[in-house]
Design a protein with these regions (language model features):
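Short beta-strand-loop-alpha-helix junction that forms the active-site gateway
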Residues: 144-146, 152-163
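Nuclease catalytic cores
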Residues: 1-148, 166-180, 184-186, 190
Length: 192
């Protein structure tokens, strides 16, 4: 009975602590990867109506599904469908269309279009030696010159109170890709 109780007690405690990259409180071990901030169009600020969680979800959903070489008609279809799905307003629709068109015309996405290895919504799980498991989903990752290029899309990247958290998130993505593939990585926070 005592042996059984010990096994039950041991089994009742989690063996690993799982955390997601977007909520990481610390940096990954090792050297940090280069993280750069890129912007689609700094001059085309959206209105106050096209901000917040719903707008971010709208843009992210479209960026997740849109072909990297989509034309305006294809982009509009996805924006319209997601606008209806999320109950977004006309201003959010207009701003999302502009954001997605801007992102797809950005040089980073042009580079991704020509990459032989390109992943979108790329899930990662990394076990750390300290009993933690890191999980994350990368918006866009591609290989260029034998190096991972990680792109994370943010509609609120200019929010200074979130910038450090976003950069930590990218550090964890880079760490995981380097651990899994043994290739160097760099990252971009793309303000859209």
């Amino acid at each position: 009975q005592a042996s059984r109780d010990r096994v039950i007690e041991a089994g009742s405690r989690p063996e690993y602590q799982v955390f997601i990259a977007s909520q990481a409180l610390d940096l990954p071990p090792g050297e940090p990867i280069p993280v750069e901030i890129a912007a689609v169009n700094k001059h085309a600020k959206t209105s106050r109506q096209a901000a917040g969680r719903r707008f971010g979800t709208l843009v992210h959903n479209v960026m997740r599904d849109v072909p990297l070489d989509a034309d305006r008609t294809g982009i509009e279809r996805l924006v319209d469908w997601n606008t209806r799905l999320l109950g977004s307003n006309a201003e959010e629709r207009r701003a999302a269309l502009a954001a997605v068109e801007g992102a797809l015309s950005h040089p980073l996405l042009a580079r991704a279009r020509t990459a032989a290895r390109c992943h979108r919504e790329y899930p990662l799980v990394t076990r750390l030696g300290d009993g933690r498991i890191h999980e994350g989903v990368i918006d866009l990752a591609f290989v260029e010159n034998n190096e991972w290029v990680i792109v994370d899309f943010k509609t609120d990247a200019d929010a200074s109170d979130r910038r450090a958290q976003y950069e930590r998130q990218l550090q964890w993505y880079g760490f995981a890709l380097m651990q899994l593939t043994k290739m160097p990585a760099r990252a971009f926070l793309l303000e859209i």
